A protein has these predicted regions:
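P-loop NTP-binding core
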Residues: 1-243
């Protein structure tokens, strides 16, 4: 969702956007960054500037953002970055460093999007400490409710301890299909956290997978209009909640 949101804000809304990739897999970085074509026809991202893992240092000599083809700026994470995975072992006070280093830079942007791993750990804490709002995209499964409860408890804990202005926008149902299992999981969430569910949902749509994998806006795909409509509805609802 973060990748399509970056495209939407930068290209459709013409906003000044910074994306901070805090997921060690680096998928957002590889899709947004400039790319070069390899001999086998595949592509590899050209990653420059400050890495997300470097933000955890106590001292940092300036931050260099990367300019992406879509118009957004990016602080990147290389694919499966061991340096960022290692940040899970740092002392809790070190997770406060990115917020300290980035505060001034954030002032230059209309929106800052932080892509976070779904796991509860230092990277999530670091992201929540410097956020104004948080939205949780959730894939439905038998464990969706357990996962959401754990995540919400962490968010509330971080809010109480470090960032009392943090606002929980809610839960976005992502990649939903018409199966009995998904329907059951959705009903379970509706019973557990009814006030937190976004009205709009993103269904399982192959064009959205294709667009995200290829690093292009879903609305640019000829056959992607249904997926594009759903993504746009969710993003508009999100922007409305942010106000």
């Amino acid at each position: 969702l973060c990748i399509q949101q970056a495209f939407y804000l930068a290209l459709q809304k013409k906003k000044k956007v910074l994306v901070l990739d805090m997921d060690g897999q680096g998928n957002t970085s590889s899709r947004l960054a400039p790319r070069r074509e390899l001999e086998d026809g595949d592509y590899e991202p050209i990653l420059t500037g400050t890495k997300t893992a470097e933000l955890f240092a106590y001292e940092l000599d300036g931050i260099e953002v990367m300019h992406c083809p879509c118009g957004a700026d990016l602080i990147h994470t290389p694919k499966n970055d061991p340096d960022l995975f290692e940040m899970e072992a740092v002392p809790l006070d070190q997770a406060m460093n990115p917020a300290r280093h980035l505060a001034e830079l954030f002032e230059n942007y209309d929106y800052v999007l932080i892509d976070c791993p779904p796991s509860l750990g230092r990277k999530l804490v670091a992201a929540l400490v410097m956020s104004t709002h948080v939205a949780c995209p959730v894939k439905l499964s038998g464990f969706a409710v357990d996962g959401v409860e754990g995540l919400l408890n962490t968010i509330i804990g971080v809010r109480e301890a470090y960032n009392q202005d943090l606002e929980i926008l809610g839960i976005v149902i992502n990649d939903m299909d018409r199966s009995v299992n998904h329907d059951k999981a959705l009903k379970s969430l509706e019973n557990t956290v009814p006030d937190l569910l976004f009205e709009n949902k993103i269904m399982h749509r192959p064009p959205l997978d294709t667009a995200t994998t290829d690093g292009i806006p879903v609305w640019e795909l000829r056959y992607g209009h249904v997926a594009a409509k759903e993504v746009e509805a969710v993003l508009e609802e999100l922007l409305e909640k942010v106000g």
